[in-house]
Amino acid sequence: MAVCIKDCIQNMNLVIGCMIGCSYCYARNNVRRFHMIDDFEKPEFFPDKLRLMEKMRPQNFLLTGMSDFAHWNPEWRNQIFSKMAENPQHQYLFLTKRPEDIVFSTPLDNAWFGVTVTSSKEKDRIQTLREHISGGHYYVTFEPMFDNIGTVNLTGIEWIVIGTETGRRKGK
């Protein structure tokens, strides 16, 4: 079933900034456009936003719309997961392009861990995600999809997002 992801997920950008440097990064462009932080390559944590988790109505929160989970400071992760435990009514989504850079485990069942795959050479990220992050649920984002991904082992993957690159970049 096709669903517009913007209709079912609220962005909660607790951390803004990313060290990966993707040429097609919409987050970096938005940060520059709206002057959110001084240096996008140096992630910053905004703990005041944790209060957004106190909403009673269950929601789906994407916590990595402007960052990569693998490069979060461990102290930030501890604060965030503590607040998540206090607010189990929500689902929390985390996304990374570098699952090899993190080893993480949580007992929380309302945490969803995803990996971005944009080409066939990145398919191994899915297995790396399962090996390096334990807990909750898994998903894969094939977005933007630059080539034919081919056959993929989706064992344990509960959700798939497929999309194209947006914006005006030449050659996309």
Annotate each language-model stretch with its function:
Residues 124-171:
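Conserved C-terminal portion of the radical SAM core fold
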Residues 1-112, 120-130, 134, 151-154:
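Conserved Radical SAM active-site core
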Residues 62-63, 114, 141, 161:
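Structural motif
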Residues 70-73, 168-172:
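A generic structural signal for short coil/turn motifs at secondary-structure boundaries
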Residues 97-99, 118, 145, 165:
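An acidic- and aromatic-residue-enriched active-site/binding cleft used to recognize and process polar
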